[in-house]
């Protein structure tokens, strides 16, 4: 199976910058989006051969996720069942016969870390949600996790130590995810690869200089380890401040 995840930073804008070309070219089995920035009815995508599932934020022009899948899931749920987290359209879960697929747009801790405390609560509740799913079947989750885990996951670690996405607290929470029996698939295949990122600020010509962060991931239950085939980061694809990430898995 070929799985793709992309934070499109506004799907309507991304549609003007080649989204459908990439979508058709990749021919993924599951293609998920974060930060669609849409309300219901604002876009009608014609994607023959795919079932579409959308989760919208209550706030306009903000957040939002989607899953496009060739195989119809057994069931699809929205959110994680925790009231305070489920107003921003951040999570969709699709159940298949052998696994759960979850797409997630993790809350940003924000400048001055104004949302760090909320982010910590989110992390605890989201991990509990994943572990509950794992009691039934293995989990594959993908999305913008808004954290660069290690120093090799961003161009300028020293100057970002106290910035959102690279605080000790956020990195520690992702370490907890891995310690709980999950795999960062890109690092599984490329443990020491440097200079490969998935997000670049629109400011300071960051993409041109490759001053980026790897904050978009595919994470899987350890029980799926032997089925992993490859993980890719499509740095050549434009259209958003993020590029798409890919997981190839035999399942």
Where in this protein do the model-derived segments appear?
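Structured beta-strand-rich core segments of catalytic domains in phosphoester-bond hydrolases
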Residues: 37, 42-109
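Active-site beta-strand/loop signature of hydrolases that rely on acidic residues for catalysis
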Residues: 7, 23-41, 101, 130-151, ...
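Surface-exposed cleft-lining segments at the edges of enzyme active sites
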Residues: 81-82, 107-123, 158-163
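Active-site-proximal beta-strand elements of phosphoester/diester hydrolases
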Residues: 1-9, 98-110, 142
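Metal-dependent phosphoesterases centered on the DNase I-like endonuclease/exonuclease/phosphatase
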Residues: 51, 125-211, 215
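Active-site beta-strand termini and strand-to-loop segments that position acidic
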Residues: 70, 94-97, 221-222, 247-251
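N-terminal, active-site-proximal structural segment of metallo-dependent hydrolase catalytic domains
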Residues: 1-47, 57, 62-63, 176
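Conserved beta strand-loop-helix elements of the APE1-like EEP
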Residues: 60-75, 204-226
